[in-house]
Amino acid sequence: MATGSLIKIDEEIVTSAVASVTLGGTDWDSSYDVYMVQYLNVVPVTDNQEVRMRFTEGGTPNTTANYDYAYKIIETLAAGFEDFPATNQTYFRGVRYGNNTGEAGNATLYLFNMNSTTEYAFYTIEENAYINDAATIAGCTGGGVLTVTGTARDGIEFSFPSG
């Protein structure tokens, strides 16, 4: 097992609209305990879309209703703070992103227990987004867990409801 440093396992550079992006799969290296994933300047096709995330098993996203998550969202809107818990979902979700000029989302995730067949896989996230031309800025911190065992996870898929 490697220790003490970050090792790049996979990278995807997207330059035009795609339905989803998957990291891992055949590029997955199962010799690590923790994986860091970052995405930068992500923009949906349709305005005001939440980023969705699923763990993959055998390169295929797990679409079962076994995703639980909780976030604290901080926005520059009047609401200010928002708690966002959900259970028995078919994906993890992040904050909404805009698609106008200058709008984008960024995040850093840490993935844990991905290679275990007996423990739940889970993640933590730090996310930020400039969401609309009214200058709404959102930040998010939280995490989630896939409450099913039996299969090792080998990656993560990102998508938007609109593609």
Where is each model-derived feature located?
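Surface-exposed molecular-recognition determinants
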Residues: 2-163
